[in-house]
Amino acid sequence: MDQDIHDQLAGHLSVMGMGMPHREGLVEILKENFTEQEAQIALMLPTTNTPLKPVTIEALSGSSTLDRNFLADTLEYLAQRGLIYSGKTESGEVGYALHQAGFGFPQAFFWKGEDSPHARKMTKMVLKYFNREVTKEAFGGKKTKAYRYIPINRSLNPEVQAVLPHDQMDTVLDNATRFAVAHCPCRVEAGLMGRPCEHPLEVCLKFDEMADYLIDHGLGKEITREEARVIVRKAAEIGEGVAQHSRDQAQAARNHGG
């Protein structure tokens, strides 16, 4: 098998809408997490889909000589490890997609909040890869931003602020149907580097399809709408903002503070 398969996968990941800049650091992260066979299979996943839009096994197996069951088992194994996204397609079938920057990469390494040798190694590798240049290219060099900060409803002053209804967290929560909470990747990384955050760790909210993914794969835990409101309210009380994914239907909110 081609010995540069991980470099090929890094290039594949770099051309997505919210892709990861192609650097040696990314190649090293991929080598640490994907076997050559797994990298070859990940290369089959399209780069043109928007985040959280999976493709079926049938669609993938049509262009592959691999056994269909082996392909399905490998993709599910990668999803269980948080290396790719898994969810339902519009037809209701199970499908898979690549993680995109800010939509699972590198967050999935830390959502569980584990302190393990692998988590510590990933912390060092991720921080080395996401230097200032790479971070700017991944998140600041695109017309469509992965995140935006939105106000918490009761903190609004309508006399001085004009905010559309969908920009209010209460509305986001009202419109969602399933809720999950995971550990904040930034705070987990800080703790693993010996700089523990004084704020709560389980504050990364996920909704609907993304909530399904985290709950089904053990990356986060299911909560109620009211429990999500409590997390948002507590964030407001300590002066944190809420970052929302830029999607027509919100999938995640992350509480951030100084």
Outline where the language-model segments fall.
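Short, amphipathic alpha-helical interaction segments positioned at domain boundaries
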Residues: 92-133
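Short acidic, hydrophobic short linear motifs in intrinsically disordered regions
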Residues: 50-64
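Hydrophobic residues on short alpha-helical segments
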Residues: 42-43
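A short, conserved structural fragment
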Residues: 79-90
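Long, low-complexity, charged/polar intrinsically disordered regions in eukaryotic proteins
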Residues: 1-28
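Short amphipathic alpha-helical interaction segments
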Residues: 64-80
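Catalytic cores of enzyme domains
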Residues: 130-258
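Short helix-coil-helix linker/hinge
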Residues: 34-39
